[in-house]
Amino acid sequence: MRIGNGYDVHRLAPGQKLVLGGVEIPFECGLIGWSDADVLTHAIMDSLLGAAALGDIGLYFPPGDPKFKGISSLKLLEQVTALLAEKGFGIINVDSVIVAEEPKLRGHVDTMRKHLAKAMGIDPGRVGIKASTSEQLGFVGREEGMAAWAVALVDEK
């Protein structure tokens, strides 16, 4: 078995869509990025790639590549999952935390878990998501952005 960690952060801006865990969440601001800027899914992908010692998402989906402009991060997660399978790895579980002051995310967590689990081909019971704040400290506390951390456990088949 192997463990990997992932982290991502994106800026918030008015007029952008907010997508977390593949779920569009109603909010006056969204995250800025080359893809859909899904900070949670990006952290999960990095944790999976790290567990398999396969680099990070920037290696496979570089910012600036027109193929990935505005793409759903769930589609990228499907590709990461396929890469792991090709290299002989299976996903046991992932656990994650999103750090944001607003909006409140508790009501969206189950839907996020289902979307992420489907993209990874695992049961939603193997996907942990927690939402937290930074107690109004730092860039997250000033509502300038959001961050996410993830841990993945994979096994070699």
From Swiss-Prot:
Its cofactor is a divalent metal cation. Pathway: Isoprenoid biosynthesis; isopentenyl diphosphate biosynthesis via DXP pathway; isopentenyl diphosphate from 1-deoxy-D-xylulose 5-phosphate: step 4/6. PROSITE patterns: ISPF. Binds 1 divalent metal cation per subunit. It catalyses: 4-CDP-2-C-methyl-D-erythritol 2-phosphate = 2-C-methyl-D-erythritol 2,4-cyclic diphosphate + CMP. The record marks 133 as: Transition state stabilizer. One of its GO terms (molecular function) is 2-C-methyl-D-erythritol 2,4-cyclodiphosphate synthase activity. It comes from the Bacteria. Involved in the biosynthesis of isopentenyl diphosphate (IPP) and dimethylallyl diphosphate (DMAPP), two major building blocks of isoprenoid compounds. Catalyzes the conversion of 4-diphosphocytidyl-2-C-methyl-D-erythritol 2-phosphate (CDP-ME2P) to 2-C-methyl-D-erythritol 2,4-cyclodiphosphate (ME-CPP) with a corresponding release of cytidine 5-monophosphate (CMP). NCBIfam families: ispF. This is 2-C-methyl-D-erythritol 2,4-cyclodiphosphate synthase. It comes from Dehalococcoides mccartyi (strain ATCC BAA-2266 / KCTC 15142 / 195).
